[in-house]
Amino acid sequence: LSTRRQRQMCIRDSYNTMVKEKQVFLPIQRDHVRLYACGPTVYDRIHVGNARPLVVFDVLVRLLRAAFPKVTYVRNITDVDDKINSRAAERGISISELCEQTIFSFHKDCKALNVLSPDIEPRATEHIAQMIAMITGLIEKGFAYEAEGHVLFSIEKMPDYGQLSGRSLDEMVAGARVEIAPYKAHPADFVLWKPSKAEIPGWDSPWGRGRPGWHIECSAMSAGYLGEEFDIHAGGLDLVFPHHENEIAQSRCAHGTAQMAAFWVHNGYVTVEGEKMSKSLGNFTTVEDALQRHRGEVIRFSLLSAHYRAPFDFSDAALQQARTVLDKFYRAVSVADRADIITDLTLLDTEFITALADDMNTPLAISCLHRLAVEANKGQLASARQLLSCASMLGLLTDENLSLIHI
């Protein structure tokens, strides 16, 4: 069966935030998919809301790798940020010590959730030279300007600014995380470089000792590893504006390209009783704490039980339900041989793959797993094999010890 057929089955319709509708996914390079996802700012342990994009885009990468000869997955580490500086000072430890501790914990949480490592995991602090070069180019081309030790991007020089978020300039100024400052030519102009005081991290630059703005970090790293234009940029819904909007502006203007990424994919929020889970509201559960009560696979399954673009309401009841279903699935696959897992998409259950191909509809895909489990419990070995293979595509039912318990 042809590789072309596998690709057609992989992502038939994927929602693209840029155009606000589903589109057929075709990579820029026929045999190579390039994907960038925004990673953590390493000042604290991740909570379940932070874990959702990790799990969702892990499934996306697994699906892409099953369909295409080469996938390059880049997920960055933001290790220069004012939150990091403040947290290190609060704890009385060095910034480097805080970052290393947090990165170690992050990787530990990813492993517990069965989130595969990206092909490349660049750290912002290791790419300052590339950021300075990109900012210099933006100034030379007239898209950025220096003011009081800061370098700012002039959003009025970018006619398409606001296309991703669909916001007008007035809405942007009124929106969250737009800092009004007297040195800005326009209130919505955003920082590319800012000065650093002696006690916080800084690097020498043409504009004095300072540090990069948040947005330039991802633009420089994605271009360095994936090129000036690449296939998919992924992240949480809260990153659409200002982060991704600003990435697009500075990247397109720096490189003179029509786009930064062809597809923009964003996951919905994790909520608690209908309210967004966030550290600022204090209604969060860290992955570390959740793992004290449930194994990582249960958390992963619960996050996949809702469509990735819809809100997911996190609760103990949701986790208990996930555990019950997983136990049922493990009983059903106990007769299957793990050596016979199917990896060819064209041989997997058609309804399951069709569900994933339609904008990664994991709830519908999971309903297919329920059907296969019912058939497997009736003694249909082929269905048990399909259940194990399809679940593997979601990063589930991978614990051989749990399968053995149910034999």
Range-by-range predicted roles:
Residues 77-82, 103-106, 116-131, 149-158:
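Short, glycine/charge-rich beta-strand/loop segments that flank catalytic centers
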Residues 276-278, 282-405:
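Structural preference for alpha-helix termini/caps and helix-kink/transition segments
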